[in-house]
A protein has these predicted regions:
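Short intrinsically disordered, low-complexity coil segments enriched in acidic
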Residues: 1-11, 153-154, 161-164
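Conserved beta-strand->loop/alpha-helix structural units within folded catalytic cores of enzymes
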Residues: 115-117, 136-139
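An acidic site on a long C-lobe helix of protein kinase domains
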Residues: 95-98, 125-128, 205
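Flexible glycine/acidic-rich beta-alpha junction loops that bind and position SAM and/or redox cofactors
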Residues: 26-28, 84-90, 119-127, 140-203
Length: 211
């Protein structure tokens, strides 16, 4: 880790990503936080850390990340705040009360938190998403990030024909952000398939969520 910290600092790479969608859920994560804090003190790296925490233990999230302070942007993926949508996606969120407690505790310490939504999920409407955003704003979360649904293999959004037909998904291809280059005089582009409409959210409504 010392080697990485030195190389990153010398290359002017200021940030680090934690490749763990449930950080702070197991004891070793607290040790990882202490290690990152020691690297920051010794090498001034990383200056910022992006990671995704688990949802089921607010105390663990707060305590395991406390050492990282303002350097750690805590992402809590809720995807949707609508119960019927969560049922369609076979997902359960942290309780609203616990989410509010986490947001308020982190805000008191001046620590940033990001709530992540995905659009358009099955059963989500423009009205239900706006209601969910208002609910999140009421918790005092620092920022809300709405991600466009990516149609990935290994998920029903790409591989389940019946699921796609049931929810009448419409998709388009787009350039992946920053994933393009010119190699040996040839332009190289990376594209991805994303959802832009369902039977419950028209393309016009989808565009409205992007304003």
């Amino acid at each position: 880790f010392t080697y990485i910290a030195q190389k990153a600092r010398d290359a002017n790479v200021t940030g680090a990503y934690l490749a763990d969608n449930n950080f702070a859920m197991i004891p070793r994560d607290a040790k990882t936080a202490k290690l990152l804090n020691s690297l920051k003190i010794k090498f001034n790296w990383p200056q910022s850390i992006l990671g995704w925490t688990g949802k089921n233990s607010k105390k663990k999230v707060i305590e395991a990340t406390r050492l990282l302070g303002k350097d750690f942007n805590i992402n809590m993926a809720v995807q949707s705040m609508d119960d019927s949508v969560l049922k369609n996606t076979k997902r359960a969120n942290i309780s609203l009360e616990d989410y509010r407690d986490v947001a308020e505790s982190l805000s008191r310490e001046g620590r940033p938190q990001i709530a992540e939504l995905i659009t358009p999920l099955p059963g989500e409407t423009l009205q239900s998403q706006l209601a969910g955003i208002n609910t999140l704003l009421d918790t005092g979360v620092s920022r809300i990030q709405s991600n466009t649904l990516t149609m990935l293999h290994g998920t029903p959004y790409k591989d389940n024909v019946d699921f796609l037909a049931e929810h009448q998904y419409v998709s388009k291809y787009r350039l992946v952000i920053r994933n393009f280059s010119e190699i040996e005089n040839t332009h190289i582009f990376d594209v991805e398939e994303v959802g832009i409409a369902t039977k419950d959210m028209s393309f016009e409504d989808y565009l409205e969520t992007r304003k």
